[in-house]
Amino acid sequence: MMSLAHSKFSCQRTRLLAVVLLAALWSSSLQQAAARVINDDCPNLIGNRDLYKKVEWICDDCANIYRSTGMASLCRKDCFFNEDFLWCVRATERSEDLAQLKQWVTILGAGRI
């Protein structure tokens, strides 16, 4: 016969296991969702996060300069392969870096459909 203390411990252990499993499943689904978003925008972001941050900085600066709602999103659209990004390069006075930025955008967007 099981003692009352052993029964309570077993119940607590089962609840703890259920919470841990749910947390693991939730975390896994969040990571998969984040990976899909990243892969949809910039297929080669994984392994090139430093390039992404350098290019993204242009969009952040542009949004800060003009305080325009959605400017950063427009700039990042299609993994920075758009006219808004080029406009932001000029607006942030980074035209001298345009060739390097275009190369980074090409690396980040390689494999993009």
Swiss-Prot record:
It is found in: Secreted. The keyword Nucleotide-binding does not apply. InterPro entries: Crust_neurhormone_CS, Crust_neurohorm, Crust_neurohorm_sf, Hyperglycemic, Hyperglycemic2. Pfam families: Crust_neurohorm. Residues 1-35 form the signal peptide. GO terms for molecular function: neuropeptide hormone activity. It comes from the Eukaryota. Gene3D superfamilies: Crustacean CHH/MIH/GIH neurohormone. Disulfide bonds join 42-79, 59-75, 62-88. One of its GO terms (cellular component) is extracellular region. Its main location: secreted. Keywords: Disulfide bond, Hormone, Neuropeptide, Secreted, Signal. Inhibits Y-organs where molting hormone (ecdysteroid) is secreted. A molting cycle is initiated when MIH secretion diminishes or stops. Belongs to the arthropod CHH/MIH/GIH/VIH hormone family. PANTHER family: ION TRANSPORT PEPTIDE, ISOFORM C. This is Molt-inhibiting hormone. The lineage of its organism: Eukaryota, Metazoa, Ecdysozoa, Arthropoda, Crustacea.
